[in-house]
Each structure stands twice: as C-alpha cells, then as structure tokens.
C-alpha cells in the first residue's frame, strides 16, 4: 500500500503494484517515447503497463497519456479498445531540444485519452 501525499522514486510497474484495485480516478503520464539513446528514454512494456493501468483505474476514471510522432501510433495500437480521442496541445514555444540537431523542433504534442 502506498502512502498518500508522498513522492516515490521507483519503477512505475513496481510502484503501481502497491496501489489498490480501482482506486485511481485519473492517470496522467508523459511516458518515455524511446526517441533518444538516453537510459531514461526506454519504452515501457505496454502489455505490463496496461495490465496495471486497467487494474488501478476506477470505473469512471480516465487514462491520459502524452505522445508525439510515431510514438502516438504505438500508444494507440497498444490498447485500441481503451482509446477514446486525441487532443492537440499547441505549445507557446517549440520543444524537443534533445533532438534539435537531428530534426525540426515541434510546437505541439498529442494528448491521448
């Protein structure tokens, strides 16, 4: 069991195991996209991720994930039955500085619900 109002620095798949079934009203997550060679940017196993998300989300809860580029398709394809719609977040400043030398910086990100 996790303690409320406390920050945990741990693997999300391990941390979610401590969360009671159906107890979360909203999951808002900016997953690693797997677009860089950085260790922190490894794509999380979608099958394991969805297993935990579906277990902890309440009946009327929302799962909201940010995505961009080809990662958007990967997220939607990983669980099409739960995908409802997509919003476009238009940013006031372009981002994606990590890849600025390889590609244009983007001014939007997709929000998948």
Where would I find each of the regions flagged by the language model?
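Core catalytic lobe of class I
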Residues: 2-113
């Amino acid at each position: 069991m996790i303690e409320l109002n406390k920050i945990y620095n741990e693997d999300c798949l391990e941390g979610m195991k401590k969360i009671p079934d159906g107890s979360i009203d909203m999951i808002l997550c900016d997953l690693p996209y797997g677009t860089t060679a950085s260790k922190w940017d490894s794509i999380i196993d979608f099958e394991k991720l969805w297993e935990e998300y579906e277990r902890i989300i309440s009946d009327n809860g929302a799962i909201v994930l940010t995505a961009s580029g080809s990662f958007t398709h990967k997220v939607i394809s990983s669980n099409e039955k739960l995908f409802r719609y997509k919003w476009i977040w238009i940013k006031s400043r372009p981002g994606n500085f990590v890849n600025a030398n390889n590609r244009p910086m983007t001014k939007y990100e997709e929000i998948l619900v």
